[in-house]
Amino acid sequence: MKKLKIEIDEMDVDHQNQWTANDLADMLTHQNHSQLNQNERLTFLYPAVDHTLVKVPSSLSASDKSSWIETQNVNPFQCKYTESPRTLYNRDDDVGSIRTSDPIPSECGIYYFEMCVLNDGEDGAVSIGLTSKGTNLNHQPGWDRHTWGYHGDDGNFFKEDGGYGKKYGPVYGKDDVVGCGLNLISRSCFFTKNGKFLGVAVRNLPVIEYYPTIGVHSKDECVEVNLGQKPFLYNIAMEKILYNAHQKDMAKKTS
């Protein structure tokens, strides 16, 4: 821990956000503050946000969702596909997608959320990504304009495109934890699988409001979304540190 503290002091990262060297050392060792409640964790991860005035996504919307998805009463972070009366998975308009109640504040800098696939159903047609307000929630994230998504059945990334997407990462399914990160500074998006960074999926994102979004599209598919109510599997705090350090290093090289 002492060595990490010295390294962080030398990096001189994120003093503007009032993180102490000990705080940052804890993050680097992935001691993800499991004792914190959701509000405390979100405040810790996004210290530049005035949490008394601005909401960071902390819940799934009760209304901004497809009719083909339902949240569970016992656990409001769990979502399940509601079986369509039509032949499943051969139609493009009976996807069950859901957004968070609030958009991602720009002050977050780098925002992150995860989902755990509890059941990948008949087809494994689960997705995670970002959408803007008003986009079609009967479609998967990534199929329409101002939507982006990483899909579990083929591992492809979809960028505002209803086609086949592009090869991005591994497929994922039952018991996998998949995360989505939005870098509001570089206007880029990345994903993780089981705590491992998969790389940047898209750059030069438009300046709009982004909502964390997940989609399900076959019988019995069920996921649990993590919006900071518990520790993330991926160490997003370290990602923020490394990004800030890289930015400062680049600034020194160009000055």
Label every PLM stretch briefly.
Residues M1-S255:
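PRY/SPRY (B30.2) beta-sandwich protein-interaction domains
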